[in-house]
Amino acid sequence: MLRTIILKAGSNASIPSLSRQNKLLRFFATAGAVSRTSPGSIKKIFDDNSYWRNINGQDANNSKISQYLFKKNKTGLFKNPYLTSPDGLRKFSQVSLQQAQELLDKMRNDFSESGKLTYIMNLDRLSDTLCRVIDLCEFIRSTHPDDAFVRAAQDCHEQMFEFMNVLNTDVSLCNMLKSVLNNPEVSSKLSAEELKVGKILLDDFEKSGIYMNPDVREKFIQLSQEISLVGQEFINHTDYPGSNSVKIPCKDLDNSKVSTFLLKQLNKDVKGQNYKVPTFGYAAYALLKSCENEMVRKKLWTALHSCSDKQVKRLSHLIKLRAILANLMHKTSYAEYQLEGKMAKNPKDVQDFILTLMNNTIEKTANELKFIAELKAKDLKKPLTTNTDEILKLVRPWDRDYYTGKYFQLNPSNSPSAKEISYYFTLGNVIQGLSDLFQQIYGIRLEPAITDEGETWSPDVRRLNVISEEEGIIGIIYCDLFERNGKTSNPAHFTVCCSRQIYPSETDFSTIQVGENPDGTYFQLPVISLVCNFSPILIASKKSLCFLQLSEVETLFHEMGHAMHSMLGRTHMQNISGTRCATDFVELPSILMEHFAKDIRILTKIGKHYGTGETIQADMLQRFMKSTNFLQNCETYSQAKMAMLDQSFHDEKIISDIDNFDVVENYQALERRLKVLVDDQSNWCGRFGHLFGYGATYYSYLFDRTIASKIWYALFEDDPYSRKNGDKFKKHLLKWGGLKDPWKCIADVLECPMLEKGGSDAMEFIAQSHKS
């Protein structure tokens, strides 16, 4: 099966001929590196926009000499010459489709021993051809500022996704794969990677109903296509509240001790009896923090967390389509269907994991919320309580911001503000700090590169080459980190092109960028894009800087964790390279990076004041972090609630009563059952975008967080810059991509053999370990 998550196997390719080498060399890191003689070059390209525009040839006023020195070639997005326009994207998609068809025809008609030995390799190449269009289109439609490009990406994605689904139900391809894997004379000559990829693709064929009758296979294709379209519609509307404003009676707000300055900024309705509080911007959130009237807060909070009825229908349709698809595949639920091949192999183990985590956390959560309960009880003139159930019953989600603010007014802290801290963490400081960290623990650095004309989709995008001290360039990261209208609002790591081996028979490298292995063979450079929405602030005439709050530093570290997995998981086959691994394993490297982002030793090395250059003091950081970490267990429990909601929306009850299933009713009933910060007022489930991308697997974040915590304490707590332990993590986990069983990777890193086989005991061990 040709998935959108794929990689290569195999025998060592022979060293190319001299003529081929000359052709290849044109594509090696062709963007010129910024001179490394300037020590702050990474910091400077992110913190000094004038410098960046000048060296990148974007400044119309730069000198003739500068224009000559930095003369730029013309190309398309990601140095793909087709991608200069929306029509070029369509052309690239058509050419890729033609190449896929030619490779397919060759595979169908080659029954020789050589054809069998290269069959899995060619399946992987076929996958790569399709995924380089599908992944590219997923990126463009989420990020590109040109609507015409976005529309073209949507069209190409639909076309290629449908073609891929047809191949996933192709009986002849599946039968040939089975014959290769079941023939000892052939399989004994295949590499471990080829066998792994072959098994993965065979499992995916079977998940597509390959053994069922043609009508069922056709239905599978139709359902998969519809799920993709409905899911994209759903995700496109998760940022929008149900209405643009909410009406609050003037008499209620005027008597709620809200600042008159804030009230004067609010419009009123025609009769002048109600304030119209917008559900966008800062006003509603400011009111949640300052309004003493609980009914007003409740109304505001509900409006901010609700969506339109149309969006609820999209979610309901998505959930029901998935249930129908799972039923078609003879599974009791979509969760059962989706969890095949994951670390947590079945819904029961997942739900047991979540419940264990909740049981271990609920008392701590109630204890964290006790200060809110005490303040609210005092306002309501009710007796104080220490009973967990009573505390949780009293404290509602619209109380959190108001009473937290009130608590700190009554108990002033000497901790610095988030704004004061952010002055030490410019975007350039943080990227430079990440490069320094990777250099010390992995022997890898980030090197800025000048881009060719047309290579990026916005002048704000920076290119970083990823350089290994042993191998040279091993990958490329395009950083689209500054806020811009039209971008996805969520931070994201997009795989644009996976790493894989380049084979001697391949001669056209015009649409990819190529690297060289130590043995002289060549590989497709992994290309990824990191997307965030950080806001620059004007600090002087024509000069702005991007100051990151510590939560944003953590976000950037998280996404760079994914990036390092993509760069270091350089297998021969693209089906298992980098982040092409089990969904409940893929977040582990990124969440581990969050531990680095919270470590005082790391932060004091990175934090330099933008004006004075002074290093941030450890005491200053400790005081600030203490003041912001007081609801940690609440956050864990909230994540567990979302994971349980995801399981609830994909369990066996959906198909049994599909006509009557109500997503909002189900959501609110679950909220009441799980007790903490109960939301039985909004339809927030329609704003939960991860229900599409992480359907039945949202538990992965919590699961990987508990594992990452154990790895941090085992390897890096004593020394976050340990090269020995960085190499250990790279050697036993990162370098394998999706080739090695995740449980085996974790067992090797932790030196804990009992985890190797996974299963319910291993899941229980991980869940219980969260208590520490």
Swiss-Prot record:
EC number, UniProt record: 3.4.24.59
Classification via CDD domains: M3A_MIP
Record field: transmembrane: none
Protein's UniProt keywords contain rRNA processing: no
Keywords assigned: Hydrolase, Metal-binding, Metalloprotease, Mitochondrion, Protease, Transit peptide, Zinc
The organelle targeting sequence, given as a residue range: 1-37
GO MF terms, alphabetically ordered: metal ion binding; metalloendopeptidase activity
GO biological process terms held by the UniProt record: peptide metabolic process; protein processing involved in protein targeting to mitochondrion
This protein's GO CC annotations: mitochondrial matrix
UniProt record similarity statement: Belongs to the peptidase M3 family.
Physiological role: Cleaves proteins, imported into the mitochondrion, to their mature size. While most mitochondrial precursor proteins are processed to the mature form in one step by mitochondrial processing peptidase (MPP), the sequential cleavage by MIP of an octapeptide after initial processing by MPP is a required step for a subgroup of nuclear-encoded precursor proteins destined for the matrix or the inner membrane.
Miscellaneous comment as given in the Swiss-Prot or TrEMBL entry: Present with 2690 molecules/cell in log phase SD medium.
UniProt protein name: Mitochondrial intermediate peptidase
